[in-house]
Design a protein with these regions (language model features):
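Proline- and acidic/polar-enriched loop/turn elements at helix boundaries
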Residues: 10, 57, 136-137
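Active-site-proximal C-terminal subdomain of hydrolase catalytic domains
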Residues: 101-167
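Functional beta-strand-loop-alpha-helix junction segments that form "active/interaction loops"
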Residues: 1-37
Length: 167
């Protein structure tokens, strides 16, 4: 047993495409159950849980992420990128996550009360994640961090994710 870690404080869209390199991926970012507009001629709206990144939108990044932006797997929020559940399903299609366990500390990962939305976890699971855990509604960082530490420490001791969360 043991734990080797890699901490990335400035996660980019490209970084999120490399989660298959890890047995356990922790998403520590802001999240939102967000309504956004898309379309040029006929405006449409969609509401979905998203993970907000600090990566700024610029000309070159927009070119690099062009297909994801056009398909709304990546959207722009206040000049930065955010990813939707479809992003993970596409990035890891064919099961490329290969059994990675994903723990999310983001707010509204599963939507909010009255509007539970599994789009992010569905994308991760369809991409081959072994298990996904996250929160509905807002979550205080102190609470999510203590839950995360307890869960990870119990998994290091040999418990399954379900056993660690049930504790």
């Amino acid at each position: 047993y043991g734990l080797d870690t890699h901490l990335d404080m400035m996660v980019t869209v490209s970084d999120l495409k490399r989660m298959a390199d890890y047995d356990l991926a922790v998403l520590s970012a802001h999240g939102a159950y967000y309504t956004y507009e898309y379309g040029w001629l006929w405006k449409k709206q969609a509401t979905a849980p998203i993970i907000l990144l600090l990566e700024k939108s610029d000309f070159w990044n927009d070119l690099r992420y062009g297909l994801e932006l056009l398909s709304h797997r990546v959207i722009k929020v206040n000049g930065c990128y955010a990813v939707t559940g479809d992003f993970f399903g596409n990035a890891y299609r064919g099961g490329k996550l290969n059994g990675t366990i994903v723990l999310s500390e983001t707010c509204e990962f599963y939507g909010r009360s009255g509007h539970v939305d599994t789009a992010l976890s569905d994308g991760l699971l369809s991409g081959g994640a072994k298990a996904v855990a996250g929160f509905v509604n807002n979550v205080y960082s102190v609470y999510s961090r203590s839950m995360l530490w307890a869960t990870v420490n119990r998994m290091i001791e040999g418990e399954t994710l379900q056993q660690a969360i049930d504790y």
